[in-house]
Every structure is written in structure tokens, then in C-alpha cells.
């Protein structure tokens, strides 16, 4: 199957041979997460380290690419997250979370290449991985690739002296509409409001439904409002056991409603989804009055774009936003390094031997 990202394959190779730092951008569903690691495995010896923001994406991508290759996960493609290692000596492409990547950069031999996928998420651990790749002497010659659908590519490339490369085109169009009655995203009455939007979408459009909600509490509220509906309702949340998450990616003969947090926002494709219902909210860690809090906040324009793109990965789709188009949102979420206490970052930076590493 040809994907939009394939159009830059030759240029990707040329630019990496000219300079080993590259920022790759393309629309959601273009194939960044699945194609780029494979290209790198063909170009460079050693382990290709692919850093994903969440464990769900690590396991899902390793499973998907292994299935395409006709083998079990842990062969050519593997995943490694906290408390779970599905890799072997034969693994060439390893999908891992930022925390695992940092430990490997300290303890393991230098990888053949490093990919930081969905870099717009800008967790402090992702930033530290990039800082290490750019600053630690034994890693400076390792090719470093940042990928995203929504990042400001020039701003990301500048501190790294990296080049940028963009793939045009997307998989399928997505029609976006707004709920005019609600001015701004809010969690009040989210259960009945989302259930009403789901019911309307199921009656007027084809395909499965993906609903973005800020947390498990809101997921349970929508689940209760749906009641005993004929569709199969599945929860997509980081607390779900691996067996439950693997079921999410298996095809079904029944129509499905996926109730998800932002773990479903990037890197993964849920089969059959052509409808997205977006609450416009997410849980974000903030530092307030001397302590860390997990707050429910409106998402950025970048996240809005990512979520809408989930509806256009398998066919033309629709996205319903549960707030008014008049509500203004920030273009990007502030990097986590600007929102939280930096004790853990400083400890890991010291362990890596980083001094004075900084990102705009």
C-alpha cells in the first residue's frame, strides 16, 4: 500500500547522508510512524530506537509492523516500555517510551539511529532525549529524526541545526463541524452531551466512532449515558491491561464506539473509525502553588488537528467538536519543561552528563 510519506523516500535518504539531523512533517495518517523506522533500518546498521510518547503506541506499532512482516512481536520489530520488554537480540527496530530511551542512552551502546516520533508532544523526557542525542559526544554522529504532523518544523530544527522535510497530501478528507450551543470545551454534563453527539453521528454517518475525553471519570460518564447500546463500546486508556488494549486493534463485525483519552491522539490507527467526537479537553500536568497537579484544560490547535485526523485514516470521515468555533485556543501546548518541577529532569540530565542543553 502506497502512503503519502512514500513520496519523500529518496529525498529522505539524500538529506540524512548530507546531515544527520532531520525534522520530518506530514499529515496525520501519512505513514511517518511506520515508514521512517523501516527506512532507517535499511540505511543504517545497529538498533533503530523509535521514541513514542505513550506505551500504547509502542506496543501497537510493534504489533502492526510485525504482523505485516508475518512474524511475532519481538523479532525484527520490538517494543520496550516500563515493566514490559518484547524485544530480542534479533530486534532491529525498537519502539520505546522516553523514559526507557533515556535509560538506554545511558546504559546501552549507541543506537544506529534515533527517531523521536510525535515530537510536538514535548514531554520533558522527549526533550531530554533530543538534548542527549545532540550533546552527548558518543551520540553526536547518530542520525536523529524528529517527526510530527503539527509541529513548527523550522522552530524545532533551529537549535539542532537540522534540515526539514515535508510530505504533502493526506490519506482522506475530514469534514469538521462545531456544537454552537457550547461556547468553550467543558466537562460539565459531558456524559449526556457526548452520548447525544454519538447517537446523532451514528444515524447520519458510516463507520466506527472515536470519542476523545479528558480522563477515565469522563469515559465512565459517557459509558453510563450510552446505556445498553447495540454497538460495542471499548475503552482506550493507559490504565487498561495489555490484553484489553490488543483487543482494541482487532477488527470486529459489530459497529464500535471507542471512548479514549489522548492516548489515541497520535501514532495509532483504530480500525474502522470514520467519526471523531472531540470534547476539546485533556488532562495536563501543571505546577501550581508549589505542587504538581493534574488539571483538565482545553487542548491546543495542534491537538485539535491530530484528533480530527483520526477520522481520515481509513476513509473520508467527520469530526464533531463539542464547543463553538468562536472559542479561541492556543496554537500549541506549552512544552512540559515550562509547566512542571524540573527535579527529575535535572537528575537525569546529570546522569547523561548534559550541561547547558536548552531548547526554545
Where are the regions that the model predicts?
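P-loop NTPase motor module signature
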Residues: 1-360
Amino acid at each position: 500500500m502506497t502512503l503519502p510519506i512514500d513520496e519523500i523516500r529518496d529525498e529522505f535518504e539524500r538529506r540524512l547522508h548530507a546531515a544527520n539531523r532531520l525534522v520530518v512533517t506530514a499529515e496525520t495518517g501519512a505513514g511517518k510512524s511506520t515508514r521512517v523506522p523501516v527506512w532507517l533500518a535499511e540505511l543504517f546498521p545497529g538498533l533503530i530506537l523509535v521514541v513514542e510518547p505513550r506505551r500504547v503506541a509502542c506496543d501497537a506499532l510493534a504489533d502492526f509492523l510485525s504482523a505485516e512482516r508475518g512474524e511475532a512481536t519481538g523479532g525484527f520489530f520490538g517494543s520496550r516500555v516500563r515493566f514490559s520488554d518484547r524485544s530480542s537480540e534479533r530486534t532491529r527496530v525498537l519502539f520505546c517510551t522516553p523514559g526507557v530511551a533515556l535509560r538506554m542512552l545511558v546504559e546501552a551502546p549507541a543506537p544506529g539511529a534515533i527517531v523521536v516520533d510525535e515530537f510536538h508532544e514535548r514531554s520533558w523526557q522527549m526533550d531530554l532525549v533530543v538534548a542527549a542525542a545532540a550533546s552527548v559526544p558518543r551520540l553526536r554522529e547518530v542520525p536523529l529524526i524528529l517527526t510530527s504532523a503539527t509541529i513548527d518544523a523550522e522552530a524545532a530544527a533551529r537549535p539542532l541545526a537540522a534540515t526539514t522535510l515535508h510530505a504533502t497530501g493526506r490519506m482522506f478528507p475530514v469534514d469538521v463541524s462545531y456544537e454552537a450551543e457550547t461556547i468553550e470545551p467543558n466537562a460539565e454534563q459531558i456524559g449526556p452531551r457526548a452520548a447525544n453527539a454519538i447517537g446523532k453521528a451514528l444515524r447520519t454517518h458510516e463507520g466506527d466512532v472515536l470519542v476523545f475525553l479528558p480522563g477515565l471519570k469522563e469515559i465512565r460518564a459517557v459509558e453510563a449515558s450510552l446505556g445498553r447500546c447495540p454497538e460495542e463500546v471499548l475503552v482506550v486508556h493507559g490504565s487498561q491491561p495489555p490484553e484489553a488494549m490488543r483487543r482494541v486493534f482487532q477488527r470486529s463485525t459489530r459497529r464500535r464506539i471507542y471512548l479514549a483519552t489522548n492516548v489515541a491522539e497520535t501514532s495509532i490507527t483504530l480500525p474502522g473509525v470514520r467519526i471523531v467526537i472531540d470534547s476539546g479537553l485533556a488532562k495536563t500536568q501543571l505546577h501550581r502553588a508549589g505542587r504538581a497537579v493534574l488539571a483538565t484544560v482545553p487542548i491546543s490547535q495542534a491537538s485539535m488537528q491530530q484528533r480530527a485526523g483520526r477520522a481520515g485514516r481509513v476513509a473520508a470521515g467527520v469530526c464533531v467538536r463539542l464547543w463553538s468555533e468562536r472559542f479561541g485556543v492556543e496554537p500549541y501546548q506549552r512544552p512540559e519543561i515550562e509547566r512542571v518541577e524540573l527535579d527529575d529532569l535535572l537528575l537525569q540530565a546529570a546522569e547523561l552528563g548534559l550541561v547547558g542543553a536548552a531548547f526554545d
